[in-house]
Structure formats: C-alpha cells, structure tokens
Amino acid sequence: MTGPDTHAVKQFLLALQTNICAELEQLDGEASFKAESWQRAEGGGGTSRVLTQGKLFEQAGVNFSHVKGAAMPASATAHRPELAGRSFEAMGVSLVIHPNNPYIPTTHANVRFFIASKEGADPVWWFGGGFDLTPYYPFKEDVLSWHQTAADLCAPFGEEVYPKYKKWCDDYFFLPHRNETRGVGGLFFDDLNQAGFEQSFAFMRAVGEGFIQAYAPIVERRKALSFGEHERQFQLYRRGRYVEFNLVYDRGTLFGLQTGGRTESILMSMPPLVRWEYGFTPAAGSVEAELYEVYLKPQDWLQQA
C-alpha cells in the first residue's frame, strides 16, 4: 500500500477552498468572503472564510483546518476503538451554504484526511467526505441533476461506488427523533484506504471538485424565482432540522468540539436565522407537505430520471 503524501493533500485542500470561494463569489455577484486564520494551542490551525448578507447567499462558510493532537478524541474512535490513544493529524475542507431564497437549497460538503500514529506501529490513514443537498422547496430536476453528477464522478472508480456512498449518505444524514432525512442526500464516505493512497486521494479530489459542478447549476436555475413571507418562514422552520442534526448527531461537529477546535469555525454551519414552531404540520396537499411525503425519504433518484 502506497504511503500517504500529506503535503500533496494539504496543497489540494487549500486550492479547493480558494476555488470554491471564487465560484461562490461569482454566483452571488455582490458579496465576497472574509478570511480569518487561527491557530490551535495543541497544534495546527486553519483558515475560515465566510460570506454574509450576499445577494444570493445569506451565509456561506468554507473552512480549512489542519489540526494535530496527542490522543484521538472519542468521536473519532467510537467506531474504531483500536485507534484509542494514538496521536492524530487531521486536515480537511468543510463548507455549508445557506441561501436567502427558499427555492435554492442549503448544501454541505466536506473532504478530509486523517492519520493516527503510534510509536512502533505503522500509521493508520484514511480519507472521508461527501456532499449533500437540503432543499426547502424541491424540484425533481434539481435532485436528479445533483445525483447524476454524484454518480458520474463515482463511475471511474467502480459501478458499486455511487450506490454504496449514496446509501451511506441517506443513512448518515437521518434524524431518528424526526424519522426523516435531513435532505435528499448525495454522497458520504469514510475510512477510505483500501485501494491505496493514490486511488483514495483521487476519489477524494473527485468529490471535492465535483461539489460545485453539482450545486452551481441548481443555484442558476432557481436564483430568479420570487418568494414571499410564507416561503421564508417555512425555510426558517426547516433550518431547525439542520441545527438539530449538527448539534446532536454530526461526527464532524463533535470531533471539532472534543479536540478543542475553534468554536466559531465549527459552528459556522449554523444558519444565521432559524425558528421552531410547536406542533407544526404542513397543510394537506401543499408543496410544503410534498417535501415531507416525497423528498425526505431515501429513494433511488436516478431510476426516476
């Protein structure tokens, strides 16, 4: 198995952050990202880039981090207890975009690389990541194009890759207490190292670069749609699910908090405005009801193309 080239991974991640920010600024057309670099006392640091109050994007955050620590946190060893006590090095790019327009979906993407080391033993390394889409007023055309882009980028790596990581995404971004998915899914992968470093790194690059190819056309299709206070209030209500998932279930959020990461960067994924409403149910036959009845249930979208 080829050894890991951490320098190459870091350079790719830094370039990816820059490229995605440039693409999002071009889409928005008005606002620009503000960058803030930070250091972590235990080792490492990162750069957070945040765009706020744009023409299209209420808030978009694209974060790069490269952190080191003497002992793996509980969130990283829960499903791999054999790694407990190892030192670690983690780097990645994570982003969340909260649009103004309820017809443009919220989205999240992440690509990351992890090494766990112990004296006298070979390092254990792996890649992870993915991207997912959270519409408020879904259009089937958008969901299909999103999944088609995901399937196309997976295809060179094997026909089993897209179905496997699509299902993993559906399973991961699920809120048990609501019995619904967070959105319409996408891709999610972790512990990727079986094919060796070069092939695993190539897949991570494909996912990172494929994200904006999947998201930008959806933004372009929906950015001119007009909306009113009713749609805005439903968007704010549904954003509550994002908060619930990230604070209760998300491994990345828990990892950041447990390793003493930069809180502002970790919670950058939170929407700037959100609301809860006791006992809310959408009106029967409404487009809001269709979200619950059709879209928040895992399904084979590409069969419907």
From Swiss-Prot:
UniProt-listed Enzyme Commission number(s): 1.3.3.3
Residues at the catalytic site: 108 (proton donor)
GO cellular component: cytoplasm
Pfam families: Coprogen_oxidas (PF01218)
Cellular localization per UniProt: Cytoplasm
Signal sequence interval, chain numbering: none
GO molecular function, one term: coproporphyrinogen oxidase activity
Entry keyword annotation includes Disulfide bond: no
Cofactor(s) it depends on: a divalent metal cation
Chain segments carrying region Important for dimerization: 242-277
Pathway terms, separated by semicolons: Porphyrin-containing compound metabolism; protoporphyrin-IX biosynthesis; protoporphyrinogen-IX from coproporphyrinogen-III (O2 route): step 1/1
Residues at which a divalent metal cation binds: 98, 108, 147, 177
Known role: Involved in the heme biosynthesis. Catalyzes the aerobic oxidative decarboxylation of propionate groups of rings A and B of coproporphyrinogen-III to yield the vinyl groups in protoporphyrinogen-IX.
Description of how the protein assembles with itself and partners: Homodimer.
Family: Belongs to the aerobic coproporphyrinogen-III oxidase family.
Protein name, entry field: Oxygen-dependent coproporphyrinogen-III oxidase
Taxonomic source organism: Shewanella denitrificans (strain OS217 / ATCC BAA-1090 / DSM 15013)
